[in-house]
């Protein structure tokens, strides 16, 4: 069920992400994710342009003749599915490459918001954390890949593959974007992937709204070059206002997806 308060807060965190990337103390930590984003997007854009015609022809071959009168609509939906699959490829690759930089950016944003250091690790300790960060990215890939494969197989079913699958793919992409970027502040505090997934699911409207805005902006030229650090900053603010007190400093507290959490935003006073 749609929660209007969560819808509003999801939009708020996305907008605030744009505000944070302009802050003087964060600019140098924003540059590297932007550079990586630019290189990856250029490479995948070239790949997309070179393969889009063949991909469309392949998908359209599954449309039966008796649905030819809907060919224009089905063509648009097929292109949307292909775009989302390319987008999933982009976020997967960028997640592995940019994980250390995004984790550091999330740490600096949290320090700016709270005035507290997450840890006092030196450069050597940070480098030792890189394998753990990459393992976390692999965990996200293991979670998402079976679902992407299932959606891909469903796309072979006539009509279903060109109507329902694009919608399901978009919703799943929104959910994965929330997981992808919220994971950086969660992981900085060693919060497990399953706990993170469950608490984000308890506020699903907020998560899908935030992830949906990130997804849509990825397809907008110029804006898509900045979206990675924007999403990290917005997700970190979401962590601080919604989850930090419950999870970051009270890890002995057991969590149950059946019971949930009473999560409040300190700034708004809204129970989400």
Swiss-Prot record:
Signal sequence extent: none
Membrane protein topology class: Multi-pass membrane protein
Main location: membrane
Domain of life the protein comes from: Bacteria
Pfam families documented for this protein: EI24
GO biological process, one term: sulfate assimilation
Cellular component terms per the entry's GO annotation: plasma membrane
Listed InterPro entries: CysZ_sulfate_transptr, Sulfate_CysZ
Keyword Cell wall biogenesis/degradation belongs to the record: no
Family of the protein in this entry: Belongs to the CysZ family.
Protein name (Swiss-Prot/TrEMBL): Sulfate transporter CysZ
Disulfide bonds: none
Function as written in the Swiss-Prot or TrEMBL entry: High affinity, high specificity proton-dependent sulfate transporter, which mediates sulfate uptake. Provides the sulfur source for the cysteine synthesis pathway.
Transmembrane segments: 29-49, 66-86, 148-168, 219-239
Keywords carried by this UniProt record: Amino-acid biosynthesis, Cell inner membrane, Cell membrane, Cysteine biosynthesis, Membrane, Sulfate transport, Transmembrane, Transmembrane helix, Transport
Organism: Haemophilus influenzae (strain ATCC 51907 / DSM 11121 / KW20 / Rd)
Gene: cysZ
GO molecular function: high-affinity sulfate:proton symporter activity
Location within or outside the cell: Cell inner membrane
């Amino acid at each position: 069920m749609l929660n209007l308060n969560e819808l509003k807060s999801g939009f708020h965190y996305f907008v605030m992400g744009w505000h944070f990337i302009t802050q003087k103390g964060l600019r140098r930590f924003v540059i590297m994710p932007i550079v990586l984003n630019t290189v990856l997007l250029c490479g995948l854009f070239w790949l997309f342009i070179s393969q889009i015609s063949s991909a469309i022809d392949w998908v359209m071959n599954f449309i039966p003749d008796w649905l030819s009168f809907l060919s224009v609509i089905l063509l648009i939906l097929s292109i949307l599915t292909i775009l989302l699959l390319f987008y999933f490829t982009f976020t997967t690759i960028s997640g592995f490459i940019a994980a250390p930089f995004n984790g550091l950016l999330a740490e600096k944003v949290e320090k700016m918001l709270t005035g507290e250091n997450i840890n006092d690790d030196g450069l050597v300790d940070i480098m030792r954390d890189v394998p753990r960060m990459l393992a976390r990215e692999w965990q996200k890939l293991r979670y998402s890949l079976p679902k992407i494969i299932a959606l891909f197989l469903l796309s072979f079913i006539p009509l279903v593959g060109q109507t329902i699958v694009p919608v399901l793919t978009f919703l799943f992409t929104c959910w994965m974007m929330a997981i992808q970027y919220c994971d950086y502040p969660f992981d900085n505090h060693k919060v497990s992937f399953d706990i993170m997934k469950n608490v984000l699911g308890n506020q699903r409207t907020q998560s899908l709204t935030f992830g949906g805005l990130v997804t849509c902006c990825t397809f907008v030229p110029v804006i898509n070059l900045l979206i990675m650090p924007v999403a990290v900053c917005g997700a970190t603010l979401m962590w601080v206002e919604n989850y930090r007190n419950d999870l970051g400093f009270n890890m002995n507290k057991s969590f149950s997806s059946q019971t949930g959490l009473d999560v409040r935003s300190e700034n708004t006073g809204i129970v989400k």
